Structures are given as structure tokens and as C-alpha cells.
């Protein structure tokens, strides 16, 4: 076998479109571009955002200075109380302990506890954030909540 003997897999290549080569060729006359108009001419179409010569929206709006271009939202690792219901009494709940137990599989950021579900045993929760409803439910069960970083 030599390099010049190599051929593409059967059916893997498509024939190129031969435009303007007669009506029966399938792409004759107007070459699939319809009838007249700017999009039918050579040189292709207009750029994105072009409004036909009218001042485009991105130039009509004023420049806003002194604003950060991109403000990154803090992403949390979210856990509902429903996932903590089976933990033994007196357990400490933190991102590390939840990952060890397999309740959380990926670290998407600081731990945030959400209030969906019920908890019946006292737990010590160490998290970056907790919703008000979750805090009420944990403290009603005799647990403690410790907010990290404050």
C-alpha cells in the first residue's frame, strides 16, 4: 500500500456544488440564491448587526463608563435538607464531609444549604450560606448553623 492508493471511505465524501451550470444541474441560473436583492449579489450578505444603513442599535445606545465588563456571580454547591435527613444525630455537615459520604460528588464552589425537605436530628452545619427556611428547620431540630467567612 502506498500513500497515493489511499481513498476516502465509501459514502464519506459529498460532491461539491457546481453552481450556475445549467437548470438540470439543480443549482443553475440563480445558484440557489433566489431572485434579485442584496443577498443574491456577489460578495455575500451584510455583516451581523447591519440595519440597512440606519444607525445600528449598538451605536444608538450611549457608552456606559466605569462599569465592570463582567461581574462573576458566585456559584454555590447546593444541597437540600432532604439529602441530610439520613445523617446520624450530631453529625457535622461541611462540604468536605458531604463529599466523603458521597452526598456531593462535585465541588461547584462554597456550600449552600437549601430548605427543601425536613430534618429530624440535630446537626452542626458549617456552610458559606443557608436559606432562612433551612436555618429555621435545623435549629428547630436542635442543630447549630455556622456561617463560614463571616
Curated annotation (Swiss-Prot):
InterPro entries: Ribosomal_uL15, Ribosomal_uL15/eL18, Ribosomal_uL15/eL18_sf, Ribosomal_uL15_bac-type, Ribosomal_uL15_CS
Compositional bias ranges of the Gly residues kind: 23-35
The UniProt record lists the keyword Hydrolase: no
Any Pfam family the entry gives: Ribosomal_L27A
GO biological process: translation
Keywords: Ribonucleoprotein, Ribosomal protein, RNA-binding, rRNA-binding
Top-level lineage group: Bacteria
Disordered, as annotated region: 1-57
Function: Binds to the 23S rRNA.
NCBIfam families hit by this protein: rplO_bact
Family recorded in the similarity comment: Belongs to the universal ribosomal protein uL15 family.
Subunit field text: Part of the 50S ribosomal subunit.
The protein, known as: Large ribosomal subunit protein uL15
Phylogenetic classification of the source organism: Bacteria, Bacillati, Cyanobacteriota, Cyanophyceae, Synechococcales
